[in-house]
UniProtKB/Swiss-Prot annotation:
Keywords: ANK repeat, Repeat. InterPro entries: Ankyrin_rpt, Ankyrin_rpt-contain_sf. It comes from Rickettsia bellii (strain RML369-C). This is Putative ankyrin repeat protein RBE_0489. PANTHER family: ANKYRIN REPEAT DOMAIN-CONTAINING PROTEIN 39-RELATED (PTHR24171). The lineage of its organism: Bacteria, Pseudomonadati, Pseudomonadota, Alphaproteobacteria, Rickettsiales.
Amino acid sequence: MVRVTEVVHTKKHHKHKKIPKLISSRNLFKAVEKNNIAGTKFLLEHGISPNATHPNDSIEYKSLHWIISKNGELIEIEVGIDTPLHIAANNGYTTVVKILLENGAFINARDSFGFTPLHSAIISSYKLSSIKLLLEYGTSLTLEIIDGYYRGKTPVGLLKKIGSKKDKKVVALRALLELEKLYRNKELDKIVKKTYIKEPHIKDFIKWKIEAEIPKFIKSNISFLNKHIKKNYLLLISF
């Protein structure tokens, strides 16, 4: 007769035997792709690098950047290997982005075309939640794409290339990136003192809001920005 304790022991032993097979960079990519927060944490806690690159024999986890002609025809596909952070940022999985960054993911990791996670977040329908978080963690605003159709484009340059000037989300995102750049370069005081900003109350309000919390301000004041940026900040956002 087999005792219950022996069955439990056998199951536990069998379970532990399977765990090493689950701990792999391939499964980290799968967890990130599915926005599996618990799975991502588990794999990172068990030693999988947040900077792993997926084996290049699987196109499923490669970055796909496509160029579509005016008539909607697909005319070119570019393929480069992503990191988990590229995938999380590209999909707007903010919690997973944060987990990866907190566990040592390289915030400015480059795929084979030179896309950083910020570039990936921008090109994928302007994932604002990912962009905000990447900015908070200090992602570069000056790194350029090194190959392909978008070669030489910084994050702002990429947004100019793919975004419509009439899209309020694009206008707000341009403002966010440009203002963040000015803020980092400590040039904000110079900008708000320019004479082309005529209304003192707007000048003070803008400065206070930007210094306090740029991303939240941009997200909650899209209509304000759309109106006043074009009127008062043509030197800052040059369409």
